[in-house]
């Protein structure tokens, strides 16, 4: 089926308890655990960042080691790399944050 070729479910290498659904979601994951990624390129670059939730097209796409973050919405928290304990809700919410911590934003382009 065509859709199966573009969907990964639970894809990672040595990580544990991760859930991924969408092309390239959690693509680079190595040892990170407890992540949930739903959407095209959600948490795509994540390697060791754990306990993150990314839902939406490119949500938290550039995250590598950031942990305990939530990004819900298209490109929410997209540029975060090492930031932690951030909560972003809305399209492009917090998409300019790269290393911030303990930020919360609600709404389209909030903190973006």
Map each language-model feature to its residues.
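Glycine- and small/polar-enriched repetitive beta-structure motifs of secreted/surface proteins
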Residues: 1-112
